[in-house]
Amino acid sequence: MAKTVQDILAIIEENDIKMVDFKMVDIHGQYRHVTIPAENFSEDTMKSGIGFDASNYGYAVVEKSDMVFIPDPDTAVVDPFCEIPTLSMTGNAMIIDSPENRPLAQYPRNIIQAAVQYMKDSGVADEMQILPEFEFYLFDDVTWQVEGRCVGATVDAKQSYWNSAVEGHGVVVPKQKNYHIAKPFDTSYECRSEMCLLMKEMGIDINYHHPEVAASGQYEIEPQLGEVVHMADATMMIKYIIHNTALKYGKSATFMPKPIYGEAGSGMHVHMLLFKDGEPVFSDDNGYSHLSETAHYFIGGLLKHIGSLCAITNPSTNSFKRLVPGFEAPVTVGYATSNRSAVIRIPAYAKSPNKRRFELRNPDATCNPYFCYAAILMAGLDGVKNRIDPHANGWGPYDMNLYKLPEEEKAKLQGLPVSLDEALDCLEKDHDYLTAGGVVPEALLKNFIAAKREECRQLSAIPHPAVFDKYYNL
């Protein structure tokens, strides 16, 4: 049941709340916030909103940057990281207009809601559920420096193999042998457990948490399936909880896809399924891997647009250092059951009709989740609309280890973009599926591409320490 203003006022009184914090997201997927004293919160706050400068969020030009933020009462939670009792809410950005404000089309939360409405209008489904997997590193120490005479970074995790020579330590994990390792080698169990308990308190149900492959402090937390807009909100809150809880334990968390060369990268695999009138759209006992024709067309849309999707689902230059062979990261455009070398995997363990689904394995958590999930939905719906058959297009199913194919066979396969610049090229050429129905504004795509091009330019101009190995003595 939806919360009302009276419900929020009751929460404020019951918890002796002193501050109300409004969390918004910028174009890159970073939380920003503005806070008001609790006594200033009223029904007018919910209607008129809180003013902010949208140009600093990447959504507007300076001369037309006044917007208002309208909180969504259903997102209200007590923030456990504030010493002063604080109620937190997220919501939507609106353009100031008369007689009524109207939604800011470029704001990512508005976009995912528009994508869901587009899905409903299409008649394909009335609900999308997703399950993003959160892989991340916890470091005990991290330093970096980017100056003219010094460019470098150093990380440390006490349980890592590189600390085997530290006197009196002894508890270390061999390289790439951290997966599901138990105590005493799992040195972050309490930290992750507290993260999950906090998520539960904030309305996010969890399946499990565990150590991931990389011995240098890599872990995973997996929530349960949930409605896509709720899970976009949850994605932001999960990252917020992980970052803040890590600091409490004297660690820092990073969702960088590839913080350490030679170690497993961190992704954010996204499982997905659709429902219509409460019935699973993707289930068919007679289909390949028990998936329906609609599910296969949805897969076809994802695979057709995977190049441009990568600009949104993997929007950092570091993202493409993860998408390389040898670390269970996808590099090939294709689908199959239980195959982690293809970009789409159908989990064999999802046997119940209400759980039959597939996962897109290339995304990572440097994305803006609202934009990411909306783009995934729009690509899939385009596949359904245009009946894009993944098998007929030569994208599988690939029921073999694609990493171990002979080179001449690998050469026949379509690969993912190898850089952010290449993915942005794809997005510039292929984005009509995103703008269909006015879901993603052209203006946002233009701003996003320009911002990411500038990132690529800046980072490519900085000499990497590894070039000294190659060129210093020539």
How should each PLM-predicted stretch be described?
Residues 2-474:
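Glycine-rich, acidic/polar active-site loops that bind/position phosphate-bearing ligands
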